[in-house]
Amino acid sequence: MRDWIPKRGLTSWQSLDKLNTKGDSERMIDSTAAALEAVNDAWTRICHECRSVLGSELHYQAMIYHSLRCDGRVPVDQLGMNVKQWIPNVTSDLFKKLDQSKNESFRGGFEPIPDIVIFSPNVGGDWRRRRADHTMKHMLVAIEVKASERANRRLTYSEIAGDIAKLSAHQEEARVRGYNFTPIMLVIDTAPDPKERITQTTSNDLRALCIELGVEWRYLDPCDDEVQRIGSEHRLTSGNEQDK
């Protein structure tokens, strides 16, 4: 039991010794393959629950997190949201460009913030910003979420493509350091008005970009859900396949 779990959060009839922080149904996730299996197991619930309400992008992220905990059975100490990860001395072209675009006094690296991350067990339930390299080492899956939530506007190609490019650059930074993870772009496009959803042409172009950059594409509209795994066989045998 970690000594930083606050006792004040327990009721009078509970004790730290009896508190079960590992649910009985939680699974062992120590590889990229196991993390992707958890995402697949959660996918039906993600589709159902994200179609059941209309809300903000942040709300959909929370629903995806909930689905990964429930049906994906991802342990609580291996599932992070909005994970800040400062990367000094970036090597990818995109992150170099983004670093140089900042005020000179703030240069020296770039900080991607994946919406949802599944980690290997050795992350130890601690993915604070101060542990950036440790956090990167133990990433298995990183998910970026985009949702159609604007009135009289649809998501644009550039908005989603920007996140796809950042996922790819983040993976490149990890690989340079001897790590690896699978990047996933998940688009919740459930707006009831077709004029507020991306066009088929945009969808096709985004899928093509995912193929080019090696990012898994998942798309959900009000009727159909689409999963396109890009180069998954290569990714599943690369880098952080087993927890180290």
Give the residues covered by each predicted segment.
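Non-catalytic C-terminal interaction segments of nucleic acid-processing enzymes
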Residues: 6, 18-20, 24, 194-244
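Active-site metal-binding core of divalent-cation-utilizing nuclease and nuclease-like domains
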Residues: 77-136
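Surface-exposed cleft-lining segments at the edges of enzyme active sites
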Residues: 47-53, 103-105, 147-155
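Charged, often low-complexity linker/regulatory segments
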Residues: 4-71
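Conserved catalytic cores of phosphodiester-cleaving nucleases, focusing on short active-site segments
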Residues: 116-120, 139-149, 167
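Short acidic, S/G/P-rich loop/turn micro-motifs used as interaction or catalytic elements
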Residues: 123-125, 148-153, 191-196
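Mg2+/Mn2+-dependent nuclease catalytic core
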Residues: 137, 148-171
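Nucleic-acid nuclease catalytic cores
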Residues: 171-201
